[in-house]
Amino acid sequence: RNVNDYSVEEKNDQKSVRPHKKKKRKRWVMILIFAIEIILLLVLIIVWYVVGKLEMIERPAIDRDAIVINRELDDDTIEVLEGYTNILLLGSDARDNTVEGLNKLGENHTDSIIIASINNKTKEVRLVSVYRDTVLKFMDTANTQEVKYNKATDAMFYYGVESAISMINTNLDLDIKDYVMVNWNALIDIVDAVGGIDIEIDENELHWINEYLRDTGKNTGRSYTNVENTGMVHLDGIQATAYCRIRYGGGSDFRRTERQRTVINLVVEKAKNMDITKLNSAINSVFGNISTSLDVGTILNLAKSLASYTITESSGFPTEVTYVTTLKGNTSDRDFVLAKDLAANVTVLHKVLFDVDNYDPTPTVKDINKTISELSGAY
């Protein structure tokens, strides 16, 4: 055989191999495409599932044009505020156990008013409770523009959530546009979903937690077990809710708001370590008792960073207070909490929330401060 014969055979062998390689490559391409399709399908299922869960949340129509932000905020303040996501957290005393009952005018007060400020870069969270009995200016921003100077808790009662948000913005120079509001059932369920929390209970709290347990059980239809011991105690959902409601036994509303922030902190820390099964249980039980203005996309973005959130500040507003039992133009005698110089307290607030030194409040805040001083005669 000559060289040319071998050459022909080699070429024939090469021709016979090529179709096999093409078939193999085509099969791998098909497998890859199929795998990508499966992954996309799974992603779509997960998105559908999560969005479906989020749709359980009550989203009443909110008139964003009726949410007031002080126009006199200067450029530096606006720039600072844009670095944070500020949300108003509201706890309703609604006796109506339905989520629709959260937004009924003339029925519910916001016993818990908490400013949650999230640093968009560091994910640091700072919580400041506005004491419910603090005298602030609020108005019917959505309709009549009627103005009242009364307890902060009354804004929601008289005029609704737009008024409550606007009250915080105009009195404290903030830019809040969104809120999350829960009833007692939501708090009960979320604490139960994370497996309960451990709280230090003193003698006064032991008495009052059981008093509030009876009332909370009556109004929610939930069964409960009395707390028996002082010291470090493991509380279930309804016990933790009763703990958050305590106003007596020392510390009044100041101590109560501290309890509320403590419970939030403990729940967040436990939620960060929840497995998917428990997280799903929490979603199922809690979302049906929440009202919010946040859209699905915003909630998903916030949820993505849950593990990164760290609550680094927990305090109350105002920091310097005084008390009166009457206000000019207010016919009822009530225990009012006054910011001892509202403008000075707002300066402190901006340091606490945003690390701004020597903040100069807007003329609006200074005018409100002057009016409260005249109505109360306290400073």
Locate each region found by the language model.
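Amphipathic, coiled-coil-like alpha-helical scaffolding segments used for oligomerization/assembly
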Residues: T153-G221, N273, S293-D295, I299
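Second-shell loop/turn segments in exported
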Residues: T98-L105, Y149-Y158, D173-D178, R247-R255, ...
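N-terminal targeting leaders characterized by basic, low-complexity, disordered sequences
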Residues: R1-K21
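Flexible, polar/acidic helix-loop-strand segments at domain edges
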Residues: E82, D189-K278
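Entry/capping segment at the start of metal-dependent catalytic domains
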Residues: R18-K23, W28-E124, N301
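Extracytoplasmic
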Residues: E82-T85, N108-I113, N120-V130, S163, ...
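C-terminal solvent-exposed extensions
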Residues: N70-E72, T134-D140, I290-Y379
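Extracytoplasmic/secreted envelope proteins and their assembly/folding machinery
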Residues: T110-I113, V161-N169, W184-I188, D192-V194, ...
